Amino acid sequence: DTVPDSALITLTCTGFYRLWINSVEITNGRLAPYISNPDQMLFYDTYDVHTLLRQGKNCIGLLLGNGMSNAIGGFVWDFDKASFRSSPQVALSFEAVCGEKTLCFEADETFRCAPSPIIFDDLRSGEHYNATLEIDGWNSPDFDDSAWTPAIFSGVTRGKKLPNDTDRVVITKELKAVKIYKGHVAPTVFPKKISPVAVELSK
């Protein structure tokens, strides 16, 4: 019932993740934690979250992506047969201090899961996003997740765990489409002098 004096989240993922606390996204850049082979190394991020916590219920929200661990388009390099291939796995620990008391927990089967509006994602092929599958308020403290599925314990990855001291991957420019074609697959046309990009849109 008391807001802690300090609170840290330590987090890594075999693919990519995005992190929200009480509906506020605090992810350390794009493609977090970083692109790596989870059989060799995994970078972990640490977040100071105490200013985002409040009295009563709080919510940690995660969105996971395939990254290197499930590179669907990597068959040219036999990534489809890689020993580390799997759905993205996450490891998270929370530690808060309030006076002389300490609260600690880790991500386990009490965390709950559901499919996201991202219906396809690949390290090299981008993602398909279906906005009709969005779930309002899913990362807020008052959301009812009783219909969601409990997380599954997946074991420990073999890669060495390293603190993430890499440069953040950030968005430097956003492009607006200049034309959209109707059809089964709707390519989006960007201005000239830009590498060709195709985006599948769902309404």
Spans of model-derived segments:
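Accessory beta-strand-rich segments of carbohydrate-active enzymes
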Residues: 1-137
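Activation corresponds to long, low-complexity, non-globular regions
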Residues: 101-203
